[in-house]
Amino acid sequence: MAKKPTALIILDGFANRESEHGNAVKLANKPNFDRYYNKYPTTQIEASGLDVGLPEGQMGNSEVGHMNIGAGRIVYQSLTRINKSIEDGDFFENDVLNNAIAHVNSHDSALHIFGLLSDGGVHSHYKHLFALLELAKKQGVEKVYVHAFLDGRDVDQKSALKYIEETEAKFNELGIGQFASVSGRYYAMDRDKRWEREEKAYNAIRNFDAPTYATAKEGVEASYNEGLTDEFVVPFIVEDQNDGVNDGDAVIFYNFRPDRAAQLSEIFANRAFEGFKVEQVKDLFYATFTKYNDNIDAAIVFEKVDLNNTIGEIAQNNNLTQLRIAETEKYPHVTYFMSGGRNEEFKGERRRLIDSPKVATYDLKPEMSAYEVKDALLEELNKGDLDLIILNFANPDMVGHSGMLEPTIKAIEAVDECLGEVVDKILDMDGYAIITADHGNSDQVLTDDDQPMTTHTTNPVPVIVTKEGVTLRETGRLGDLAPTLLDLLNVEQPEDMTGESLIKH
């Protein structure tokens, strides 16, 4: 006899917003979503800021969203953890940071601080640099060199001078610190093994061969005059302020997101590095805020927090079968992030990865691979052996990032067509579906003055539970979805899953 499946269906980047202006969610013709919305219990939940472990007002994203959904609790993100440690003083007691400083003091050498200089909050936050400067001052370090990477992607394209001026004011206030080199993130934070870019940043940091300017400000202004924005500022040295990274020095890299900090770190802290010819620095103490990758020999300031009893682990412990299914763009989200940062499959778990289309930008193919995902899921459902399904439709988010209204409307209409077939099939099998989202995006793809808006939103996301006769709580957060799934599956919720089922009892 076929099992009765319970499915979590994530419409990526699909949120509630009153205004119709630039709102693909409202403007799309979506008869299936509307049919379920009008027939079954609904609510809306928060998917941003403090509700998902980010700072107040910070928009959510797919990684954070899926991690909170799978964990069934608020998962404090690196940015929030670090901010909290600075606020409560633990930061200044941190062993790794103090070891880096002790290394400098015992060698009478220099402390170098690497990091993205902005308050974007995606890769780093410049206030963490300020805390490092305060710590160095407190511990009596005399030589502190800041190697600043300019943003222009997660913040305004030309906002670097503001951050430079504020940092220089901090140098003056504390009486330590100076800008030694400046690089656009295009060079210092590449992630696609374009070593010719990294080499330019490396040369500026090591005080080898790079353009030289009297001040950081002067160098940035020269780039602006050449039509470059912050991201693309060619790495330069600040005259008489850079001694290079030398034997016996220490480096602290304060980016907390690994993907764009790993390559530069490998140049300094991977003895087997082969991207280009480097002069190894001897007796270098290298510390990174989080673990960037396995090849880097670094001391880790904030170790990863292990998440136990995620939805997948509970399913395994209750001998339930589960399927994770998505197209390439969101496959890591339904697997690695949904499982709390774990790559291995659980017992009883299987996965279906559908290739995303090979197009330059997804507005050229708004349906992406939604139909193929739907067909693969129907095939899996026909086997009749599934207890739990976690499905992601990528389209509203990936096409929403284009900031183009018509393609985003088409994306949602394609997903709605697929949603109808999938949910009706689950209902035919006497199963249940929770239809929801991980964060906003397609709910606003145009600004008020009709400019493309390519970022996520902080709007709440809808929840439909296809079970008649139940009432849902009026508010909640992403961390309440896993408890709701367990409720539908009649599985006991473990203590460390602190979210609450959205179903009122």
Curated annotation (Swiss-Prot):
What reaction gets catalysed by this protein? (2R)-2-phosphoglycerate = (2R)-3-phosphoglycerate
Which GO terms fall under molecular function for this chain's record? manganese ion binding; phosphoglycerate mutase activity
* Family the UniProt entry places it in: Belongs to the BPG-independent phosphoglycerate mutase family.
Xref: InterPro entries: Alkaline_phosphatase_core_sf (IPR017850), BPG-indep_PGM_N (IPR011258), Metalloenzyme (IPR006124), PGAM_B_sf (IPR036646), Pgm_bpd_ind (IPR005995)
**Function summary:** Catalyzes the interconversion of 2-phosphoglycerate and 3-phosphoglycerate.
Which residues are the active-site ones? S62 (phosphoserine intermediate)
Q: Which organism is it from?
A: Staphylococcus aureus (strain MRSA252)
Residues involved in substrate binding? H123, R153, D154, R185, R191, R257, P258, D259, R260, K330
Instruction: List the gene name.
Output: gpmI
This entry's Enzyme Commission designation comes to: 5.4.2.12
The UniProt annotation places Mn(2+) 1 binding at D397, H401, H456
Quaternary state and interactors: Monomer.
The entry marks the following residues as binding Mn(2+) 2, namely D12, S62, D438, H439
* A Gene Ontology biological process term: glycolytic process
Name one cellular component (GO) term.
cytosol
Q: Which cofactor does it need?
A: Mn(2+)
Pathway info = Carbohydrate degradation; glycolysis; pyruvate from D-glyceraldehyde 3-phosphate: step 3/5
Give the note describing cofactor binding and stoichiometry.
Answer: Binds 2 manganese ions per subunit.
In Swiss-Prot or TrEMBL terms, this protein is called 2,3-bisphosphoglycerate-independent phosphoglycerate mutase
> Which is an annotated Pfam family here?
iPGM_N
Q: Could you list this entry's UniProt keywords, alphabetically sorted.
A: Glycolysis, Isomerase, Manganese, Metal-binding
Among Gene3D superfamilies, the record links this protein to: Alkaline Phosphatase, subunit A (3.40.720.10), BPG-independent phosphoglycerate mutase, domain B (3.40.1450.10)
Q: Which HAMAP family match?
A: GpmI
